[in-house]
Amino acid sequence: MLGKKTSPKALPKRRGFILYQGPSMLDGAPIVVIATLSTSNVKTGDAIQTWILRDDMNPVEATKTGDDSSICGSCPHRHFNNGACYVNVGQAPNQIWKSYKRGLYEQYDHKLHADYFRSRVVRLGAYGDPAAVPFEVFHIIARLARAHTGYTHQANHKNFDKRYFTLCQVSADSPKQATKYQKQGAKTFRVAMEGDGLLPGEIECLSDSDGIQCVDCKLCDGVSQNIAIAVHGSRSSKFNTAIIARG
């Protein structure tokens, strides 16, 4: 019938896709990147989550042996360093790795699967640091998606690809660090202790101040805004201790 609108064809249901299998850009060890299409994460909202994992070992084991450096690099908050990382590696990362080993995720094919990303917000690195992944992998996905968010702790790593300044906020653990990275041209995401003020040009994370989800905010894209957030998570006291120890 003339003038009748047709709904777009629904995409076949998928759990997720393997975006990359290959060497870590940080140390050359084998890693895998998996995008999962559904989430229950209340803070981010309905974003595609990407998980950066060791290919050859369970993520729980990797955190115990220190081999998580392939995906977390020099992040001071790694569990191996008794740090303040809020990710419970035994939950989602572990389950996703097990599902991957059971063959439950398809290899991403741009011609077949691009539409799964086009109308979505993508979170680069729900676990693991995006800088462990070849820049081109996430650059393609970020350009395809409606929007993206991402964070890296690797700005000082010897193998850091500075093109990630255009995709990710640089994580900062102090006002001094934030100022340093901003002078290098990065947008920062600073974790602040309770009572800290904002630096010039910073705004408070809108999830904290206004309850806005990441899918609606979309400012943590590496180019929009410097952000600060109060330290959070069950291991936050370890962050406080580390910051106090460093002065």
Locate the predicted segments by residue.
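Class I S-adenosyl-L-methionine
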Residues: M1-G247
